[in-house]
């Protein structure tokens, strides 16, 4: 989720390659999420599950446009492809990069995917995925996610003379609770998603959740589903608050890590400067391609030590203020902010830059380099109720570089409402997924996620101290 050195040239090359070599992917129309949706003739509806490890397409309900005898439905006869679709030559659709999906079952159903043993125009295809499967997500997963970065799906059965690819919609009951919008601020658009609980007489708090580096762009559903942030609207978390809680999920156009500081080439420096992360996996390929065209310089360490204030600080604050004006039932003394990875950095950044505004913070696997935090900034943070969450196995945001020394300094400044949940690792809690079956001593060892994914625990309301979960604790905090 994070970058190895700031190296803006590297980022420039990645973005350049993306736009030069990969034309704009787009569906025929912009897709939103519904609680339920019925496909019309020759249409399909995608059912997306918000897993701890990310979104997955678990089933597709499609309308054959004719009655289909269940005796003629054989799973082996169906071919289902996940496709990237792009606009080419003035809106002529071209299908590109097909993934052949493994179908576990196809059957006749009602319009909502419930199995029936009689002829129907509706059929349902089921899929099964292992955690973190690259074929599971409905999103194309580009570095900067565009509003249309959703896969198309194509269902083919030559025996039944079927070919269906027109998408009627996508279904996820939690995502359907959220509305999406955009705010033009500082000359560009900032997308966001938000949820308001059913209206009650009392004022309610606001939870602001900030995504990581992989969920930036202009598709707020990626910020919602990419790391299961939709769970903030679940009954389990909403019931921690007497009146429920409003939820605001802003989406950075690029990443919260962009700072106000410019390098010698006039490009914004990213914070932190010397960390490892997923972009390095792309940079080698990008350089090898472009080296045949232009001269690509080697990495050079960044010499600017204090690139730390996010370029999006004021834009995010503008969005928060506008949202508060539009929702006067929100209690301004109970505004909570949290986020993971780059969003954890941005959480601390906002608490420092806007002292006294927020009631509490929950920075998770945060990447604000401790050595960049001045004593004055630590003093500001020490006055804010904080609950840090991290895993010992986090190699991307090593506790020794980030949360551990910061936490100790906060203790030294007398922070009175300070908490840290440090997990041994990040393990599946659902009981559905297990490690490789090569451990004879513990064959039921749960699946272990990357140690950076400690947001899984937070968004499942798992961290607990003195009998209170993290969101129960949050509900008690006031400015």
Placement of each model-derived feature along the sequence:
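The conserved beta1-alpha1 loop
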Residues: 210-212, 365, 390-391
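Short, proline-enriched alpha-helix->beta-strand connector loops that line the catalytic pocket
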Residues: 243, 380-386
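C-terminal catalytic histidine-bearing segment of alpha/beta-hydrolase fold enzymes
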Residues: 387-395, 401-479
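A domain-start/cap signature at the N-terminus of enzymes
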Residues: 27-61, 82-204
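Active-site machinery of serine-nucleophile hydrolases
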Residues: 213-314
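Short beta-strand element of the alpha/beta-hydrolase
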Residues: 202-215
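Primarily recognizes the serine-hydrolase "nucleophile elbow" in alpha/beta-hydrolase
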Residues: 324-380
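Bacterial N-terminal signal peptides
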Residues: 14-23
